[in-house]
């Protein structure tokens, strides 16, 4: 008999909460589980719940519904009716990377000294929130807070609010906002049938790339399915500290690096906006134009307006779907046995069209009895 050792996370670091999935400590052995549990998506665009710094990851992925690559299916023996072509969802441009350097010391979770750590999937707001108090090797304390969202209102949009405050001393900061294409997979086990197909060559091929001020646009296309993808990022930095920025981009990489002379107690707010557009027919010029139109609108709105729209969407969702969260039953609706809003001590009658009652009558059984 095969025995498997079950990994049990420490309960104090993963406390139960009504509205949040909480992580109170960094545990590398649970990276894969947390990336899945803390993922954000809106049905079109999805981002696994890895850290903003780009790692460490079990399988860092940003995915788009319907963006796939085709490949031949090879069988040991061929037969009539066997599928010849397979389709695999491919990882797209990772635009959520934000790296932090304090006096040239990188913030990297496996080697960092966090004095406090809190990361949570906020089910009321539809965001992934994180707050870390980091002490650098030089003893400088840095408060890092971030909030990530994938918009439910505009399916092409995602955004990150990344905030840094030095508490006890000044320092030279670099906040590097990056986007990367065709990153190698971190942990792919070729013998695991649950894993996605491994492509040996390039999947996304460069079509167009350019930068405008703090905005970078990268356009790629799959080789065989000929689906086109455009990813654009733009930024807004707010701080009273002296700062400058530098933009670098290539076929598969984009970077906007902000250099800040941070003072203690002076907050630094970076808003990063990401836009994804795909098409099976539009060319690179048209798709880049669409991404720019969307980005212009998003930048004008700002992160707070995106967040407010997200919170309103989630509030409407919970009110409509959950009777206990403010949903008011219509006058003609009768309480159901499984309806937590109904009175369990009072008898009730089902609507005339109740499918469960019809099935019971056809089977010669009694209809629902009143709850006693």
Feature map (PLM): residue ranges:
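Acidic/polar, glycine-enriched structural segments that form the non-catalytic walls/loops
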Residues: 2-372
């Amino acid at each position: 008999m095969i025995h498997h050792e079950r990994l049990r996370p420490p309960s104090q670091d993963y406390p139960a909460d009504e509205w949040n999935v909480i992580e109170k400590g960094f545990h590398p052995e649970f990276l894969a589980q947390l990336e899945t549990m803390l993922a954000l998506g809106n049905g079109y665009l999805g981002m696994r719940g890895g850290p903003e710094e780009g790692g460490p990851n079990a399988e860092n992925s940003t995915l788009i519904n319907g963006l796939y690559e085709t490949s031949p299916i090879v069988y040991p023996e061929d037969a009539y009716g066997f599928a010849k072509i397979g389709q695999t969802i491919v990882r797209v441009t990772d635009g959520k990377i934000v790296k932090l350097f304090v006096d040239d010391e990188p913030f990297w979770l496996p080697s960092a000294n966090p004095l406090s750590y809190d990361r949570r999937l906020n089910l009321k707001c539809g965001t992934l929130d994180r707050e870390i108090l980091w002490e650098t090797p030089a003893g400088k304390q840095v408060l890092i807070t971030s909030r990530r969202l994938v918009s439910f209102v505009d399916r092409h949009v995602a955004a990150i609010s990344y905030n840094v405050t030095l508490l006890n001393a000044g320092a030279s900061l670099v906040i590097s906002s990056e986007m990367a294409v065709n990153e190698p997979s971190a942990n792919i086990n070729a013998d695991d049938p649950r894993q996605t197909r491994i492509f040996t060559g390039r999947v996304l091929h460069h079509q167009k790339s350019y930068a405008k001020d703090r905005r970078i646009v990268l356009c790629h296309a799959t080789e065989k399915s000929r689906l086109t993808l455009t990813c654009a990022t733009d930024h807004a930095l707010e701080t009273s500290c002296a700062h400058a920025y530098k933009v670098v981009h290539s076929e598969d990489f984009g970077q906007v690096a902000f250099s800040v002379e941070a003072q203690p107690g002076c907050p630094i707010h970076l808003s990063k906006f990401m836009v994804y557009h795909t098409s099976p027919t539009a060319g690179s010029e048209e798709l880049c134009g669409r991404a720019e139109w969307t980005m212009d609108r998003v930048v004008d709105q700002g992160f707070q307006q995106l967040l407010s729209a997200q919170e309103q969407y989630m509030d409407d969702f919970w009110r409509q779907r959950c009777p206990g969260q403010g949903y008011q039953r219509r006058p003609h609706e009768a309480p159901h046995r499984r309806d937590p809003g109904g009175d369990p001590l009072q008898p009730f009658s089902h609507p005339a069209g109740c499918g469960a009652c019809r099935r019971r009558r056809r089977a010669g059984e009694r209809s629902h009895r009143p709850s006693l």
